[in-house]
């Protein structure tokens, strides 16, 4: 059963911590350890943090089954866990070829993943509203905005050390029908979305159908609103094959802090404060993107490096906690932002577990002809090579191996 699998994983991690904590244990040779260069203390922190993540995933399911995981969670919260960016469990890319490079790089292949994937309007609006410094690191401004300027105008804009050529297209040359599009609001309702002239930051409106494909980046025509270059895209940093900020992430310290904040808010642990864990999670997320804590400039336009005041950001409306139940929504939102382009699987799992950020579920539900996916289906060879266990597992899921089947931790 899935309960037994979770218990087995808990046991594996406990045993790993026991072995690594033994002073007579030599651990891995530093030149054989690609994660922590033979540092046993970091492996212990990673194991404890992984266990804490798994316990957060399954807390409610175990509680319903008669087992309270709170004492085990408290033991970790009072002990050793990932708490600094140097504790992050992630791998660097060599950048020597396509297979050993960051997944959105443009040096090899078509570069379509980089050019055609776009942030949603909700995400960009949210980041603009709180002037989130991560936006200036991960994304670039609209390269060909529809403009109120009377003639086509070029402007070079430097952000975070990268220079972008922005070409303003006069609105006089645009079909008026292309200045509005039907989209969906955060409740899934169909609304009219106007294009904001001269926008530097304009995310992709949520479409009416999941099949809608946005135009390519070569401005070949069609609905100008939906042209790729009319919308915010990934920054030049994200196109690189390798960089200290572009890593294969297993788990980061910022996630652990948000897990601790959630656990403290829910009463699963009694150590620390929700506020301290939450704000430390934000600061660690900023730090991993090399956002400098300092005096924030009036604008990040023209910057060689993004600088922001960490404490001032945490005090902003929409970010600061207020001690109410809404704090769980803010924790989930900041955790979701910290997962941007680095840990999509955990972001997906977290939403399935908590239902937060809530707007995702509302928009997904508005596509009523589709069943929301909760899980990956089993590999095809399981049904033939492991038929007995496969059949038993599918039976526990309700008889069908479907993405929409809820797992034990979600029931």
Residue ranges and their predicted role:
Residues 1-284, 288, 324-326:
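Structured, solvent-exposed acidic/aromatic patches
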Residues 257, 264-268, 282-411:
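C-terminal functional modules
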